[in-house]
């Protein structure tokens, strides 16, 4: 009789563990899809904007007018950058240190403010030809996208960190078409931070 109850209990534990794993995989897929759309559109708009700016530089017919428009555009970017970074301090820089601090539990990021402000400012700044890369912003956009989905799904703090790391990896993969690098990134981050 005791063996029978042990078997029933083991089956229940296995069923619970299986459903938990499946729900985590499902949440990871949702994060990957949504972050892929966010970062994919980020990358696409950067490329289109860069080609537009490049076309303005190459148009010799209206050189003086085009240079005047470009100077005004860069002034607008500087003003918008100052305004947005004053309202949201965590969009400064690459964003990777903020993501690492969030994963370690040292800070909590305002996911929505960072998502839209970093998205808009990143597109304008990188597409305009300023000396910036898309790796850091893509990782931060992915991480805050993962956090937003975790908040929407009302996940536990451990699941939230896992979805943040998954989002960061999805952002890296979408930015550079490098899924293996993203996999290594998330394994290192998750294993390093959650094994303690």
State what each model feature region is.
Residues 1-196:
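Alpha-helical transmembrane segments and immediately membrane-proximal extracytoplasmic
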């Amino acid at each position: 009789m005791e063996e029978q109850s042990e078997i029933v209990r083991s089956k229940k534990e296995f069923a619970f563990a299986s459903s938990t794993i499946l729900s985590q995989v499902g949440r990871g897929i949702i994060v990957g899809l949504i972050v892929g759309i966010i970062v994919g559109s980020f990358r696409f708009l950067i490329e289109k904007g860069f080609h537009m700016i490049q076309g303005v530089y190459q148009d010799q017919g209206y050189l003086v007018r085009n240079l005047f428009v470009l100077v005004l555009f860069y002034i607008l970017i500087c003003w918008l950058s100052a305004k947005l970074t004053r309202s949201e301090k965590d969009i400064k820089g690459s964003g990777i240190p903020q993501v690492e601090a969030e994963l370690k539990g040292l800070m909590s990021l305002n996911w929505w403010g960072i998502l839209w402000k970093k998205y808009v400012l990143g597109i304008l700044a990188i597409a305009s030809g300023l000396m910036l890369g898309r790796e850091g912003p893509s990782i931060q956009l992915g991480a805050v996208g993962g956090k937003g989905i975790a908040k929407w799904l009302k996940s536990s703090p451990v699941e939230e960190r896992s979805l943040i790391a998954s989002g960061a990896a999805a952002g890296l993969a979408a930015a550079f078409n490098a899924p293996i690098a993203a996999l290594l990134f998330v394994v290192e981050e998750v294993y390093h931070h959650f094994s303690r």
